[in-house]
């Protein structure tokens, strides 16, 4: 297979990934592959572009490094072109409502007829099967959070609240990435393709597992946090200092002993309620939990963030200032690791945003291209799989493909 023009880099160089999906979840999987060196083809509808394009800045991050193909993959010759593309594809990711592709005639079996080694990842809100009530419903971030038990655990004691920005989309997209790579590993061993059914609500069910286990195995459900503090453990969560907010985790025998001395609670150490060797203070079960919070709040409020960070570093207590977005760029850790970077858009502008993660030492990722325009690479991709100029123009004339103007 001849690859499309692009630099060779990263741990996934030589891999061809194709995705069909809009907005965030499915495309985030494609974004990860593209930043790790895979050749990633983004399929968009011919009649209208991905709705993410209406956003002024985010698409320049989420669609960088991609090749843009505008093709009607469900109709006539457009479907034929899509299936021909699948013959040279390693991983295909589609994000839609339930078994939408199967309903339109593109089943796993049809895809495997064209490529027996193809890894297929289906990403939907409620999965490829189940009840009629749910399987075919649309889903976005908040829907998946609400249906999974994740949302009800977040927020404040007075009201649940979804986690933003778009947590379920990103977790689901990353799940698609890792699952597809796991499947590809097996395919290269057996020569037999794989189909993966990723339900966003099940991803979030798993992400919300920590507190749920107490309910599933005893009927006890953890309360929601209060003002950003850990619902179970004192000294853990969000706290206010004299000049702003920090988060901290009061965990460890020595850490608790030294902190208690600072906040005036040394006399509680070694009591039946806080015996020697205590590593965590339970907010509810320990009768001194509320007092610990009261004393800690007072001590923190009397000190600046810088003072708290210095003292906690001496005590080996984990803490961090709650940074505002403007503070990120100048933070020395961000600067040292180049966590924020710049790249050129296709129209020559400079765009700034998060850098590639994680950092591969021997085969690093790379930003080699900005977001392509609608249909920008259609002709190049179709030529790559054997279509002539006349073939491409015929698809365009029938409204089955769009090429860049």
UniProtKB/Swiss-Prot annotation:
Positions annotated to bind CoA: 97, 104
Q: What does this protein do?
A: Catalyzes the reversible transfer of the CoA moiety from gamma-butyrobetainyl-CoA to L-carnitine to generate L-carnitinyl-CoA and gamma-butyrobetaine. Is also able to catalyze the reversible transfer of the CoA moiety from gamma-butyrobetainyl-CoA or L-carnitinyl-CoA to crotonobetaine to generate crotonobetainyl-CoA.
Pathway this chain belongs to? Amine and polyamine metabolism; carnitine metabolism
Subunit text: Homodimer.
**Major subcellular site:** cytoplasm
Where does this protein come from, organism-wise? Shigella flexneri serotype 5b (strain 8401)
Q: Give the reaction(s) catalysed.
A: crotonobetainyl-CoA + (R)-carnitine = crotonobetaine + (R)-carnitinyl-CoA; 4-(trimethylamino)butanoyl-CoA + (R)-carnitine = (R)-carnitinyl-CoA + 4-(trimethylamino)butanoate
The terms describing its cellular component in GO are:
cytoplasm
Give the E.C. number(s).
Answer: 2.8.3.21
Q: What is this protein called?
A: L-carnitine CoA-transferase
Where does it localize?
A: Cytoplasm
Q: Report the active site residues.
A: 169 (nucleophile)
Determine the domain of life of the protein's source: Bacteria
Q: Which GO terms describe its biological process?
A: carnitine metabolic process
- Pfam families (alphabetical): CoA_transf_3 (PF02515)
Using the record for this protein, list the coiled-coil segments as residue ranges, or answer none: none
Q: Which Gene3D superfamilies match?
A: Crotonobetainyl-coa:carnitine coa-transferase, domain 1, formyl-coa transferase, domain 3
Gene Ontology molecular function, alphabetical: L-carnitine CoA-transferase activity
- InterPro entries with a match to the protein in the record: CoA-transferase_III, CoA-Trfase_CaiB, CoA-Trfase_fam_III, CoA-Trfase_III_dom3_sf, CoA-Trfase_III_dom_1_sf
Q: Which family does it belong to?
A: Belongs to the CoA-transferase III family. CaiB subfamily.
List UniProt keywords, sorted A-Z. Answer: Cytoplasm, Transferase
Q: What class of enzyme is it?
A: transferase
